[in-house]
């Protein structure tokens, strides 16, 4: 059994919100009641690992063939709490939506259509198989988890965020580059060139970091890492985790998402978007869905999955 997509229209948004928050309330005793910060330490250890599935002579055993990723992340609690920063400060720490999404995508059997080509669904795989795929991440934050975990599976990965975030994002990616275990990372931003002796057993991933301000973005207008994807890939997924947490962010985010989506569609790429939202304020989630449909005419669906419904994370697929 795999996840399924439940399409939205203006008539079923309220029902979805009501059902999702009612379920959350019934699970309240087993769920953290905080706002979703992964940890409040300056140095955070994060393990993205396959589930423990069997017991052998009394010992638990992990599933075979699934690579673990073990991160050491430096975050900035002072940056999160700063009142002098003119930009958003939430990107200075890791939020729990990102590791939750990464574990589900990599290891959950229900997420198989997003990992492998030629499953019995019409959903294109994120991971590169016979086709060249790319991921553009909006609001990457400082952790570098998805650029490495997903970057290890695709041909192009572009992380984007506000200027003040990028140096810390770069630091964490560089500190965890050894977690690239399937592919070889090349990058202009990180100054990593392809080796002269090409290793034919490992494909390259081009991993780039760039500033992208949602308030100013009107679509790719010059030769950038975003336009390079349209020249070299056939499929692109635009990914954003826990970037919708107040009403002010909804329109700039949807405008940026819509510009990127339309650009890649017009360039002939198979284009989809995955937005992860940590369920906090009910009215913010409802406003996001309503504006996505009514103002931007986006074909948005809820990702219905038994693992996700037991968390505070809702995934939306466009």
Swiss-Prot record:
Record GO terms (molecular function): S-adenosylmethionine-dependent methyltransferase activity
GO process terms (BP): methylation
Cross-referenced Gene3D superfamilies: Vaccinia Virus protein VP39
Function: S-adenosyl-L-methionine-dependent protein-lysine N-methyltransferase that methylates 60S ribosomal protein L1.
The family this protein is said to belong to: Belongs to the class I-like SAM-binding methyltransferase superfamily. RKM5 family.
Residues at which S-adenosyl-L-methionine binds: 95, 139-141, 161, 214, 241
Recorded name of the encoding gene: RKM5
Listed GO CC annotations: cytosol; protein-containing complex
Keyword Transferase: yes
Record's protein name: Ribosomal lysine N-methyltransferase 5
